[in-house]
Amino acid sequence: MAEDWLDCPALGPGWKRREVFRKSGATCGRSDTYYQSPTGDRIRSKVELTRYLGPACDLTLFDFKQGILCYPAPKAHPVAVASKKRKKPSRPAKTRKRQVGPQSGEVRKEAPRDETKADTDTAPASFPAPGCCENCGISFSGDGTQRQRLKTLCKDCRAQRIAFNREQRMFKRVGCGECAACQVTEDCGACSTCLLQLPHDVASGLFCKCERRRCLRIVERSRGCGVCRGCQTQEDCGHCPICLRPPRPGLRRQWKCVQRRCLRGKHARRKGGCDSKMAARRRPGAQPLPPPPPSQSPEPTEPHPRALAPSPPAEFIYYCVDEDELQPYTNRRQNRKCGACAACLRRMDCGRCDFCCDKPKFGGSNQKRQKCRWRQCLQFAMKRLLPSVWSESEDGAGSPPPYRRRKRPSSARRHHLGPTLKPTLATRTAQPDHTQAPTKQEAGGGFVLPPPGTDLVFLREGASSPVQVPGPVAASTEALLQEAQCSGLSWVVALPQVKQEKADTQDEWTPGTAVLTSPVLVPGCPSKAVDPGLPSVKQEPPDPEEDKEENKDDSASKLAPEEEAGGAGTPVITEIFSLGGTRFRDTAVWLPRSKDLKKPGARKQ
């Protein structure tokens, strides 16, 4: 067939079809059929054609490949097979053929037709197939060609069922146009269909309408057996979650009362989601009992335990998928939202709660897998998911609280003392409540101050001499901490009663002891005034050998002033244990001085 548009009168005037052959690929030689409507829309499958024409046009007999209507021949194949088995011993047809052997082919063709007619006439008389209509209850003789999954209906009832189904499909897609729901022209914006923004186009095949605009003539199929107590109950109980649920204006209730639901066949259709407790409640020997009063709480024997005692609205799980979903909890997904509260109408995530920080789009590990706390439904969500539970310590829940990160465990913090400190040291002030607690104070990101009772030596690179600050004498005395801020440096000086072995001053010393009346100054760092109420500090004169070393250090520091003002000017904290009042010159082995300090060129390399 040529690849041009040809008229297709089977679909009506203006319809055209075209057959295109494939010229390459694994399916080379096969053809594809396309149809074009009078409005210019192109259709390439029978499914699209059915959606386009709607339920008014029946395409059961339409051959999409050829573009014609194919009327099936009468099917009598099963009856003919039965007649052959029945006519084997007598074989009257073959004797007739032998008698009329040398005749024309027309007579040979007429013989099987006469045989089949005789078989169809004798089959109902010899093997009647009576049946009972499931709808009206009358008995009729069936032909035995129907499939087992279809209901046994007489011809009149089957025709009524087909017409009813066709009408219901039209009501679901288009509507009747007469009821109050069909007269509504605007969506409510609160139902699940409006919130999910599902397509309303009929050609899409979804036909998702707003719940307020759904035709009232749509009849939902009753999935009950009609025999059990739930199917025979005609009135609502008034105390189940469905009956207690507040109605939404303009919307009708789509779920049955729990007491009116069928008790048979519900769990047999489920593929999973059944645990041992529910299996024990559905034992065949258990008989349904009337619901006990609210004061008593025995274990229910019915398969619907939630029907006996109503649950509060906050703990009620709202389902908007199917009628069967309002059963005891299974492992299937549920949707807990009303669609009308402020949380359900919120579109954006806060980005600061723990659920948002867990999402991959905010850099989380996707472990909790919950939506934003500020978008949890205020009516149907579980209480543990609401933001009020998460931010109880906050003053108010008006805005999303900041995200609190978990602190690292103390075992993972292993700090080692190095030869130099980082440029910035963040020290924590000691609280007076924890005087007896043990204790290592953190200094910056990777250093630890020693516990009380030990001596500290602060070395200033390039300075004239170090300053030694021993710990307090008694554990009960509280050390007053005072910050001394330098350029890019913050360190701690303890100011209890101190014995200083050596001070960096250029004055001449006299033998004996001297009492300082001015605060101790460290070169290169501004110091704060010392409390005048503190006790006096004893000092001893330096040795001449140490003065020579100090002069060398001063000359080395003058060669590189820029380096001393930068990162090289950071102090070195070294722990000296159990000095016990020893002179500082005797402990020179504890403080080895690096050669890099004396040679500024080595540091630059």
Curated annotation (Swiss-Prot):
Locations listed in the record: Nucleus; Nucleus matrix; Nucleus speckle; Chromosome
Where does the chain bind Zn(2+) 3? C225, C228, C231, C262
Specify where the region named Disordered lies, as residue ranges: 80-123, 269-308, 391-451, 520-573
Q: Which InterPro entries does this one have?
A: DNA-bd_dom_sf (IPR016177), Methyl_CpG_DNA-bd (IPR001739), Znf_CXXC (IPR002857)
Q: What is the effect of changing S45A?
A: Reduces binding to methylated DNA
Instruction: Spell out the residue ranges making up region: Transcriptional repression domain (TRD).
Output: 529-592
Q: What's the PTM story here? A: Sumoylated, sumoylation may increase interaction with ATF7IP.
Question: Which residues bind Zn(2+) 5 per the record?
Answer: C338, C341, C344, C377
- Annotated residues that bind Zn(2+) 1 are located at C176, C179, C182, C215
Q: Where Phosphoserine occurs, residue numbers?
A: S297, S391, S399
- Polar residues bias located where? 426-439
Q: What is this protein called?
A: Methyl-CpG-binding domain protein 1
